[in-house]
Amino acid sequence: MKKLLIFSIITYLLVTINSTADNQNSNENISEDEKILKVGVLLPLSGKFENIGQSLLKSIQLGLFDIDNKNIKIYPKDSKGNALDAYLSAKKFQEMEIEIVIGPIFHESLERLDEISNITFISATNKTQEIPKNTIAFGINLDSQMNTLKKYFDEIKVSKTLLLSPRSDFNYQTESIAKKDILKFYRTYSYDSDPKKITGEIEKITKYRERKKDLERRIKILEKSELDKDKHELKKLEQKHTLGKVNFDSVFVVDFGERLKSVLASFMFSDVSSEKINFFTLNQWFDNTLFGENSLRNLHFPSIDYDNLKKFEKRYFKTYNEKPNEISILAYDALGLIYYCWSNNNFNFKIDQLFNKNGFKGLQGEFIIKDNLSLQKLKIYKVAEKEFIKVY
């Protein structure tokens, strides 16, 4: 197996700094100016998304502190969360001869960045369509999630998976999942986005009323029998809500938040148990509100390395006395990636290094950058009573 290029700042970079001391001595003829690594930071530092932008900026500053190299300089600019201001700030980076920028966050802000030459942008977006040629989509994208789920599906041998998504919402994700054809779905359904109507639609999908009537008919037959075996069966059936199995073995729900909870609760009310049927969804960023509800037990989702995320969040909180935005760890990793490439190329940053075919390992886990996407080797977690358990 080819060795991964590891750049995890906390564990690796400090070693790298020490181990490169000899190289620095042998390159004393290189001027200090040539050793400077200038990194642009393009985030929404004001406006509606200011809190997200400030959280990512603090993560980058935390990474800068951990690297502890005075020759790395960051230059933050405000994208204001829109394409025009992102473009205008990028033009200023161009004037400053900055070649690498962390940001923007949102896909909408990338609109005009392909007009900026000689700069590569590492964006936190998880969308993969219409990415400018000078931009790397560094978010936890569908490709990575589907590839990981495919491997897990093969391992646990599910073959009849339902794909469910709300009408009108998350069209991008649902259409992308279908087009990629990585996962094979037994049937595809869409449901009303109104939580009050979801239960009725799930009942139809699971044929709840038919299964309930089958139970009632069977009970009536058994009630007329005097046979011991029928009486024994009757006692068992009286504890049930339906009779018969559903015609699927797994469900993949493209949803989030309260509506996701409503969908899973509706399956439970329709007498479809998560102990018998596997339930999956997209990356939930370890949302603690998933705890405490029986219908969410054993819900599975792909995500980054949870242990590393908890360590990062603890370190961030200790430094800033506040919780980071969940995607802040990506900004931390982005700086580590840039530093790794720079320090391992005689303090000369080259864009081609980002596309190393052996891949990298950050706090988020292993990944490789290919076709302007960060393809992550994710893990699968399931929701337990008060914890997330890694199952793959």
Can you say where each PLM-predicted feature lies in the sequence?
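Extracytosolic ligand-binding ectodomains
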Residues: 4-392
